[in-house]
UniProtKB/Swiss-Prot annotation:
Cell surface receptor that regulates diverse cellular processes including cell proliferation, differentiation, migration, and apoptosis. Initiates BMP, inhibin, and TGF-beta signaling pathways by interacting with different ligands including TGFB1, BMP2, BMP5, BMP7 or GDF5. Alternatively, acts as a cell surface coreceptor for BMP ligands, serving to enhance ligand binding by differentially regulating BMPR1A/ALK3 and BMPR1B/ALK6 receptor trafficking. Promotes epithelial cell adhesion, focal adhesion formation and integrin signaling during epithelial cell spreading on fibronectin. PROSITE patterns: ZP_1, ZP_2. The keyword Glycoprotein applies. Extensively modified by glycosaminoglycan groups (GAG). The modification Phosphothreonine is found at T842. It comes from Rattus norvegicus. One of its GO terms (cellular component) is endoplasmic reticulum. Residues 838-853 have a biased composition (Low complexity). This is Transforming growth factor beta receptor type 3.
């Protein structure tokens, strides 16, 4: 029996490991969105090019050398975040193929910098002089460029006008002058153009494609990393809502996807699949550096690749029009088309650049254990017994209400990010979304805190255990642990520090990730104990006092900055919602029903049944409505567009309304009254508008797609965006509202039959009529239309009346004259001829009848 028991233990461990690997749904389908952080493989950014001021001239045309001045200004970053390297890209202007003229560069900066030069089409053997500020250096590209290039340090004037006059006095004239904030990349095109003015006069609104600085701003996004075994093939899905926050932008935008290794040293070899989706008209530009292997890019938009030097991978592209939107549909589409396993999904509301950083295969194999849920990893490590087997003291946290999104920003004093990480924005574009780690795996190393932890949660509480050895061996002995609420302090057993939080207390926040899933967030705060506490960790299960100051900033910053906060570790836990957790409301639209109808006239009386027929330059009248019980609940028409496709995910250029703002000049809104139902607390809100149809598609069947979204008339709502008018939406709508509207939208589609305009309209069948039109007889002569016939009949009537009147006038005047001339009834035969002549003469000349008589 002893032998049997001895062999049963590894068998049980193997079975438990198998259960861990196979329990639950397939890894490829378990994607619950959460705000991404720096550890996410895909980062969303907004790239912009701008300068502060500057000028350009052709004043150096007759001089032996060009003179280009760069006057850099400090950024708003703190002293510890100052940039120390700038890459200066030099290439000729468009009218010059290869630049041969000597150049002088004045590179003035408020701090010492390392200038990295990257040149294109600049002839070798040409003298070039670089004047830099004190302490700065210039690193030249490899080759013969450095043989004729010199660097000198100078003490420059700081003001623009003083520096410009100094350069003009020194060299006679200036080719270009550019003032800009320090940037990682500066692009200068050298050369002289005759269209430039003769002198350089600095202007604030200096806009030129020849002199630009590149700035990258991180953008908030949501995503997930799906757990899977390390594999040389990776599938990454990126969904972009809009490339620009400007609602009036209608130009095609280049979206750059930059692919590089996550670490510089090891070589990365991957077979990569990118599935890219954006409803807007964009051009995806793919660039890869220092990554070998094959890359396949799939998108419904146009796809391009970088230059030869920007294509380290073998790239192929495939344009597919059937790629859907939303996370669930995209994941299903990828699996149905054989693109598996899906590695990550990323959704960004606004961005024009994405950075994809790939891990080395060997490093991924070392972290293979991380694919197992964190709360169960301890079972695979026999050296560390389960920390949660020991009894815990009941939590002392005082619930604070458990408010849903947004949760307050976590101060990160002393946060030290690696140089390879993207700096976090001070105020994210989406205030309600913080850049947090992926919810599937707690961030073990973040903000300089290197500790091992595991998270376990149920439908009542969340428990996080921190390994004591890893905590103390990394130099945190004497520090203490709390949750966001400083009153929720850690307990300690023999091997772990344990922190426990109810789902609606200790600063825990939550948000809905899927219809039946909720993600809960909190943070471990590592800080120095208050002066009244003893140093070192107590033995047994003694509470760890957090001190008086739970967060930095409460005391003197100069004294407490090194010790008051060693760091913050963000952790989270996902739950399938079996019942409503405390303080969590149900679906916002559970009691709201949308509807959309099309009408023939602006009276909006009877909706058109079936397919709505429309001709060129005819109005389409649209009514959308919502039936709801909450009087503070409103709705908005987020987007309406016409498309030849029935799938609303396939965007077209015929946009009528975009983000509540009318895009078509013919859009007209109509007022409507709110209708109250006899049912208690039920009412219908309606919105009506019309637009003039223009036939831009060569097809007889079109589809009107409208996305409706819920909004709140009550200020301060955390669940829904504030209701705005179309006029306000055109000027004040930001990415925050767009992000929130996407979570509560409903799409309606109505078919439209395009009919041709003909002269014989009474013979053209129309679906607008409520009664069916019988087919015409087989042999019918199509004559004039009704209006023409009525016009002719009326004209004939008028002509007949005029003729009758004229005849009556003639008859009335000639009849009286004849009656006044009495002729004998039986004249003598001798007088007959004379009388007849007299009468004939009288009738022929009525004016002379009186004299004759």
């Amino acid at each position: 029996m002893a032998v049997t028991s001895h062999h049963m233990i590894p068998v049980m461990v193997v079975l438990m490991s198998a259960c861990l690997a196979t329990a639950g749904p397939e890894p490829s389908t378990r994607c619950e969105l959460s705000p991404i952080n720096a550890s996410h493989p895909v980062q969303a950014l907004m790239e912009s090019f701008t300068v502060l001021s500057g000028c350009a001239s052709r004043g150096t045309t007759g001089l032996p050398r060009e003179v280009h001045v760069l006057n850099l200004r400090s950024t708003d970053q703190g002293p510890g975040q100052r940039q120390r390297e700038v890459t200066l890209h030099l290439n000729p202007i468009a009218s010059v193929h290869t630049h041969h003229k000597p150049i002088v560069f004045l590179l003035n900066s408020p701090q010492p910098l390392v200038w990295h030069l990257k040149t294109e089409r600049l002839a070798a053997g040409v003298p070039r002089l670089f004047l830099v500020s004190e302490g700065s250096v210039v690193q030249f590209p490899s080759g013969n460029f450095s043989l004729t290039a010199e660097t000198e340090e100078r003490n420059f004037p700081q003001e623009n006008e003083h520096l410009l006059r100094w350069a003009q006095k020194e060299y006679g004239a200036v080719t270009s002058f550019t003032e800009l904030k320090i940037a990682r990349n500066i692009y200068i095109k050298v050369g002289e153009d005759q269209v430039f003015p003769p002198t350089c006069n600095i202007g604030k609104n200096f806009l030129s494609l020849n002199y630009l600085a590149e700035y990258l701003q991180p953008k908030a996004a949501e995503g997930c990393v799906l757990p899977s075994q390390p594999h040389e093939k990776e599938v990454h899905i990126i969904e972009l809502i809009t490339p620009s926050s400007n609602p009036y932008s209608a130009f095609q935008v280049d979206i750059i996807v930059d692919i590089r290794p996550a670490q510089e040293d090891p070589e990365v070899v991957k077979n990569l699949v990118l599935i890219l989706k954006c409803k807007k008209s964009v051009n995806w530009v793919i660039k890869s550096f220092d990554v070998k292997g094959n890359l396949k890019v799939i998108a419904p938009n146009s796809i391009g690749f970088g230059k030869e030097s920007e294509r380290s991978m073998t790239m192929t592209k495939l344009v597919r029009d059937d790629i859907p939107s939303t996370q669930e549909n995209l994941m299903k589409w990828a699996l149905d088309n054989g693109y598996r396993p899906v590695t990550s999904y990323t959704m960004a509301p606004v961005a024009n650049r994405f950075h994809l950083r790939l891990e080395n295969n060997e490093e991924m194999r070392d972290e293979e254990v991380h694919t197992i849920p964190p709360e169960l990893r301890i079972l695979l490590d026999p050296d560390h017994p389960p920390a949660l087997d020991n009894p815990l003291f009941p939590g002392e946290g005082s619930p604070n209400g458990g408010l849903p999104f947004p949760f307050p920003d976590i101060p990160r004093r002393g946060w030290k990010e690696g140089e390879d990480r993207i700096p976090r924005p001070k105020q994210p574009i989406v205030p309600s979304v913080q850049l947090l780690p992926d919810h599937r795996e707690p961030e073990e190393v973040q903000g300089g805190v290197d500790i091992a932890l595991s998270v376990k949660c149920d439908h009542e509480k969340m428990v996080v255990a921190v390994d004591k050895d890893s905590f103390q061996t990394n130099g945190y002995s004497g520090m203490e642990l709390t949750l966001l609420d400083p009153s929720c302090k850690a307990k300690m057993n023999g091997t772990h520090f344990v922190l426990e939080s109810p789902l609606n207390g200790c600063g825990t926040r939550h948000r809905r990730s899927t219809p039946d899933g909720v993600v809960y967030y909190n943070s471990i705060v590592v800080q120095a104990p208050s002066p009244g506490d003893s140093s070192g960790w107590p033995d047994g299960y003694e509470d760890l006092e957090s001190g008086d100051n739970g967060f930095p900033g409460d005391g003197d910053e100069g004294e407490t900055a090194p010790l008051s906060r060693a760091g913050v570790v963000v952790f989270n836990c996902s739950l399938r919602q079996l019942r409503n957790p405390s303080g969590f409301q149900g679906q916002l639209d559970g009691n709201a029903t949308f509807n959309m109808e099309l009408y023939n006239t602006d009276l909006f009386l009877v909706p058109s049944p079936g397919v709505f027929s429309v001709a060129e330059n005819e109005h389409v009248y649209v009514e959308v409505s919502v039936t709801k019980a909450d009087q503070d609940l409103g709705f908005a028409i987020q987007t309406c567009f016409l498309s030849p496709y029935s799938n609303p995910d396939r965007m077209s250029d015929y946009t009528i309304i975009e983000n509540i703002c009318p895009k078509d000049d013919s859009v007209k809104f109509y007022s409507s009254k709110r209708v109250h139902f006899p049912i208690p607390h039920a009412e219908v809100d309606k919105k009506r508008f019309s637009f003039l149809f223009k036939s831009v598609f060569n097809t007889s069947l079109l589809f009107l797609h409208c996305e409706l979204t819920l909004c709140s008339r009550k200020k301060g709502s955390l669940k829904l965006p504030r209701c705005v008018t179309p006029d306000d939406a055109c000027t004040s709508l930001d990415a925050t509202m767009i992000w929130t509207m996407m979570q509560n939208k409903k799409t309606f589609t109505k078919p439209l039959a395009v009919v041709l305009q003909v002269d014989y309209k009474e013979n053209v069948p129309s679906t607008k009529d409520s009664s069916p039109i019988p087919p015409p007889p087989p042999q019918i002569f199509h004559g004039l239309d009704t209006l023409t016939v009525m016009g002719i009949a009326f004209a004939a009537f008028v002509i007949g009346a005029l003729l009758t009147g004229a005849l009556w006038y003639i008859y009335s005047h000639t009849g009286e004259t004849a009656r006044r001339q009495q002729v004998p009834t039986s004249p003598p035969a001798s007088e007959n001829s004379s009388a007849a002549h007299s009468i004939g003469s009288t009738q022929s000349t009525p004016c002379s009848s009186s004299s004759t008589a």
